[in-house]
Amino acid sequence: MKLFDNLQKKIDKKKSIQKHYISKEQIKQTAKENSRIIKELEKQNNRKNVPEEEYLTKMRDSNNVVEFDDLHAYFFTDAGIVKAVDGVSFDIPKKSIVGVVGESGCGKSVTSLALMKLMQKPQGQIFSGEIRYNAKDGKAYNISKVPREDMNKIRGKEMSMIFQEPMTSLNPVFRIGDQLDEILFLHFPGITPEEAKEKSITMLKTVGMAMPESVYSRYPHELSGGMRQRVMIAMALSCDPNLIIADEPTTALDVTIQAQILDLLRSIKNDINGSIMLITHDLGVIAEMADYVVVMYAGRIIEKGTAREIYKNPQHPYTVGLQKSIPALNLNDEKLYTIPGTVPNPINMPNYCYFRDRCNKRFGKCDGEYPATIQISPTHSVACYLAEEIAAELAKSKDGEKNAKK
């Protein structure tokens, strides 16, 4: 019996390998088709002297600074199309912090790179959907249609990004001052070197940098991790942006410096009267900082709502699993909780719920098509059959109570 089981396992493994095997001919065909798509998309991006009317749009709600509407951002590889962001829709209201959370590879960073139009070219492309941006001048831009030369005027001035690795984001051969001044020269052509230096030193003071004049003259390798991150924040603030995207801003920093950076971001949001899109896998950071939370899994949003709704009343089993994974001080010698299984192959995603094979709440309905998004409250939504069943039961019981009163 044991011999038969081992043989069956080998057969199943072989079938699995054959199922995902891609022949040279298939790779060649895929590469050819992807090359055609990339060429067409790049042609659109590289157009010059495009009339503004082509990428002007209207905000669905004027109180939002950004609206992601059915965004699809793909990577066209020889092995196939990686759907890194697959139909993402959410808003970033003015004067708020929206936290985007999920494990590595869920698409949260690609979402932000699509907003900044910094996806790795030529493979990385915004394939479809809209990203509506509410500019400081009152105009609304569809970022997905803004040509490259016009995007250079928006990026850095209207919206800026704090990257997760300051050591690799800063140029090691230029002094800090040169890198800060460069942004000002780009967006304010009439500024003098003396004015740029004064503004850069002021920004270093704003982010709490001790001896800003000294830091201005140093190279990145002469600064600590926390100091480099403060430089990145100063750089992001240089042009008084409407929106700051903070991608894992506390990565590789010790807890004390992490707390300082988070406090700094919170105070900056109030000072500039702007919004922050905070990307992290750390639910503790999200709980402390965010007004609204978007939970992503395998390129899609599985749950979103206010921070209170997500933490007090999580509806999706993945969100529950993420919360259970947070280490607690009272665990004693218990094992830390982990979500079993792995994320599906991004090139060959299933047509059912992406979390199904890892879910401990799975039932018959989960074998059907990908679940639709349902509203739990005006601000809380989830894509899950279990939540759908619970909502239906609650609605039925409420109807029963009403009929009983009659």
Spans of model-derived segments:
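Short catalytic/signature loops enriched in Gly
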Residues: 58-64, 140, 213, 306-406
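A short, proline-enriched helix->beta-strand linker immediately N-terminal to the Walker B motif
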Residues: 238-242
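ABC ATPase NBD coupling module
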Residues: 137-160, 186, 309-314, 344-350
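P-loop NTP-binding/switch modules centered on Walker-like glycine-rich loops
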Residues: 245-249, 253-334
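ABC-family P-loop ATPase nucleotide-binding domain
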Residues: 1-74, 374-406
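Conserved ABC ATPase signature
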Residues: 218-223, 227
